[in-house]
């Protein structure tokens, strides 16, 4: 039994774009229109690059689609490519970024708190999330500034650099985390 393909109807869309890898150098760049319940673009890629997303956008626009907003994984170059439309950072990807820095099973109180704040990302709004993350930073500011000196070289480095990176990621991505609420 064959599946009847739905007719192609160019229209304004809210798109979700991401690259999924199945092997180290084999992935697929997909742009999906969730309200249509279909993938509008798919292309095999070896690496996740801005060009892969650019080709997808060109393909959709050439076929008559107008991207009204897009959900992205958060790669900065890709954001620039879609800078003319509202961009929503994927909450799953933001949580994965946070889990990657201080780990998914943190031991330090500051890391546990930041993970808890991030876990609530899908159940909050921009104002409350911003207030919470700012209060956390104010409380943990001196902890984040702690430095360790290497006894061999005499050079210093931030003791909690992975936690600092996690916080910085949230601050950089904050303008894109609640686009859907605007």
Enumerate the predicted regions with their spans:
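RNase H-like nuclease fold core
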Residues: 1-85, 162, 169, 173
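Conserved beta-strand -> loop -> alpha-helix junction used to position metal-binding or nucleic-acid-contacting
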Residues: 70-115
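Acidic/histidine-rich catalytic cores and adjacent linkers
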Residues: 65, 72-76, 118-182
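Short, Lys/Arg-enriched charge-dense amphipathic segments
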Residues: 4-5, 9, 32, 88-97, ...
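Alpha-helix capping at helix-to-loop junctions
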Residues: 36, 62, 87, 100-108, ...
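Intrinsic-disorder/low-complexity, polar/charged segments
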Residues: 49-53, 90, 122-129
